[in-house]
């Protein structure tokens, strides 16, 4: 058995898709375990760039099973659109598998998302308005509609009528919005379900059978630990468990079956949306990092907020996700910056703290404590060995590994797969 989890250690957008795609080469199964189409990942394959939101990165390898696990919430319309996007570019999806227990996002979830966000005013969380949160709410309230329901016309109709009655009461009475008609959803979304029905199965059985056979399984996370419902900067978080703990429940495997947990981070920090960000940069350096790093959301197109590397954040992720290995991306983006800074701790109420506060108000009051390191000017995008990096770049990477307490397994000096340098083979170690 050999299984590896890839998890973001910051606020998402760390380059997980790139690393997952890279690790997919040796995997037999690639499985997503949480989230929905609110998070995107960009993959460069055969010199072409693809942007995916739901389908796992391993889809480009026809010999690998690609699993959308039960922990995801799936928008059927988005899924059909993404399947067409791949088919139009000559990519087969015959290797895709979708859990029959995954919950389905329907138009009323998106409307609810929009109305709730508008009602919050200045206290809004900054949701992508994709209906993710409301769908997870229905799941917890036990009124959700799952893939197995969507594919059965009678069951889908029965459940949809019940849920719409509740939702429309809320829309009209609480928000003074228009009701959604049954006919506006039913036939269209039932038809979507029929388009991908051939992919739907009990994916927990598939993944566990693969592990029993000794096959290599890669679990692909979305977002990052700081957006995790329990361990993130609550309430500025997503509605699922983006930490490694989400794998067990989101795919249906026992936690003892996980061998490695790879934490992915950038050589700096970024986030989309509202919420505390202690090391955020508002100056010319921040602008440079954003433009050089193309820091714009894959899903929303929104400019990302950027800042210095925060070791407090990544240590928090190490503890809560049990990180065993570190994958460091986008080192090349920092080229040309004369002096680099790494946050080593926070100052809060006159005291130095090393752990991440639970209260977002406390976090907003934290002042980062920085350590400065000299930068480098040399172009490093062609580097393929750690020892070939400029000495200042080597020292910067080593300091990140030291401060986070995580052993480096890969680093990247550009967006291409060939620009990822592997220091150890995780599958051989498992």
Swiss-Prot record:
Cofactor notes: Binds 1 Mg(2+) ion per subunit.
Gene Ontology biological process terms, A to Z: 'de novo' AMP biosynthetic process; IMP metabolic process
Biological or metabolic pathway of the protein: Purine metabolism; AMP biosynthesis via de novo pathway; AMP from IMP: step 1/2
CC terms in the record's Gene Ontology section: cytoplasm
InterPro entries cross-referenced by the UniProt entry: Adenylosuccin_syn_GTP-bd (IPR018220), Adenylosuccin_syn_Lys_AS (IPR033128), Adenylosuccinate_synth_dom1 (IPR042109), Adenylosuccinate_synth_dom2 (IPR042110), Adenylosuccinate_synth_dom3 (IPR042111), Adenylosuccinate_synthetase (IPR001114), P-loop_NTPase (IPR027417)
Cofactor(s) of this protein: Mg(2+)
Residues involved in IMP binding: 13-16, 38-41, 128, 142, 223, 238, 302
Chief place where the protein resides: cytoplasm
Entry EC number(s): 6.3.4.4
Positions with a binding annotation for GTP: 12-18, 40-42, 304, 330-332, 412-414
Active site (UniProt): 13, 41
UniProt keyword Ligase present: yes
Binding site for substrate: 298-304
Keywords noted in UniProt: Cytoplasm, GTP-binding, Ligase, Magnesium, Metal-binding, Nucleotide-binding, Purine biosynthesis
Enzyme class: ligase
Binding positions for Mg(2+) per the UniProt entry: 13, 40
Known role: Plays an important role in the de novo pathway of purine nucleotide biosynthesis. Catalyzes the first committed step in the biosynthesis of AMP from IMP.
Name listed for the protein in its UniProt record: Adenylosuccinate synthetase
Source organism: Exiguobacterium sibiricum (strain DSM 17290 / CCUG 55495 / CIP 109462 / JCM 13490 / 255-15)
Designated gene of the protein: purA
């Amino acid at each position: 058995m050999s299984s590896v989890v890839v998890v973001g250690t910051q606020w998402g957008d760390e380059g997980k898709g790139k690393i997952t795609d890279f690790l997919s080469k040796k995997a037999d199964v690639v499985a997503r375990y949480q989230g929905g189409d609110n998070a995107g990942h960009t993959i460069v394959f055969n010199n072409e760039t693809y942007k995916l939101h739901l389908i796992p990165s391993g889809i480009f390898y026809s010999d690998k099973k690609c699993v959308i696990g039960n922990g995801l919430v799936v928008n059927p319309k988005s899924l059909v659109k993404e399947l067409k996007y791949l088919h139009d570019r000559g990519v087969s999806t015959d290797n895709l598998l979708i859990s029959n227990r995954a919950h389905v996002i329907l138009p009323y979830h998106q409307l609810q998302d929009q109305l709730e966000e508008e009602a919050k005013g200045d206290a809004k969380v900054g949701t992508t308005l994709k209906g993710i949160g409301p769908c997870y709410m229905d799941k917890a309230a036990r009124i959700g509609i799952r893939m197995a329901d969507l594919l059965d016309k009678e069951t889908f109709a029965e459940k949809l009528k019940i849920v719409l009655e509740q939702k429309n009461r809320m829309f009209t009475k609480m928000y003074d919005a228009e009701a959604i008609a049954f006919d506006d959803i039913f036939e269209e979304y039932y038809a979507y379900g029929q388009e991908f029905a051939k992919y739907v199965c009990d994916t927990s059985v598939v993944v566990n059978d693969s592990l029993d056979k000794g096959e290599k399984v890669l679990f692909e996370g979305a977002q990052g630990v700081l957006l995790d419902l329990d361990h993130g900067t609550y309430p500025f978080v997503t509605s699922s468990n983006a930490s490694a703990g989400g794998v067990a429940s989101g795919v249906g495997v026992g936690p003892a079956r996980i061998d490695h947990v790879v934490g992915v981070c950038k050589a700096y920090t970024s986030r989309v949306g509202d919420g505390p960000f202690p090391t955020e940069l508002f100056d010319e350096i921040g602008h440079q990092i954003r433009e050089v790093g193309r820091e714009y959301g894959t899903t929303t197109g929104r400019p990302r907020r950027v800042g210095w590397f925060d070791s407090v954040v990544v240590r928090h992720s190490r503890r809560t996700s049990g990180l065993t290995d570190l994958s460091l991306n986008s080192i090349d983006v920092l080229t040309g910056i004369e002096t680099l800074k790494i946050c080593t701790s926070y100052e809060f109420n006159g005291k130095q703290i090393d752990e991440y506060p639970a209260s977002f108000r406390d976090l907003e009051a934290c002042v980062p404590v920085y350590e400065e390191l000299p930068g480098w000017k040399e172009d490093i995008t062609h580097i393929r060995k750690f020892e070939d990096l400029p000495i200042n770049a080597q020292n910067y990477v080593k300091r990140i590994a030291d401060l986070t307490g995580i052993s480096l397994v890969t680093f990247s000096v550009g967006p291409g797969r060939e620009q990822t340098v592997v220091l150890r083979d995780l599958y051989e170690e498992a």
